[in-house]
Amino acid sequence: MTAYRIDGARFSTLEEFFDEVTRVMIPDDFWGHNLDAFDDILHGGFGTPDEGFELIWDNADLSRDRLGYPETVRQLELRLKRCHRSWRPFVAAQLDQARAGQGDTVFDWLIEIIEDHGPGGRKSESNVTLTLRPAEE
């Protein structure tokens, strides 16, 4: 099985995470650099193997911190500016939660998307295995 290794020490924002995905997983392809497009990449066939792959996330503990509530607040503020007005109350409520240090973080969003493509996930046919590795001490 093909394995891709991303390094949490190389990024501290969602945009930089997307850059790392490009560098490691699909260096010759253009993609949307958003959560929906990342989900599409995990299906396979978009520069990634149809039969699935392992995603190894080095320094995942660092990513958990860097992609925590401050980055989540920043992302939700951006989303609030761009979203359709019918979604604004929902996004504003998420933003209030994040400002209070509650709810899912950007790190959680990414993990949920990846795990949805693995064993027991709604899109398990993608056969993506996630391995989180802490920083080596």
What are these model-predicted stretches?
Residues 1-137:
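Positively charged, polar, low-complexity stretches
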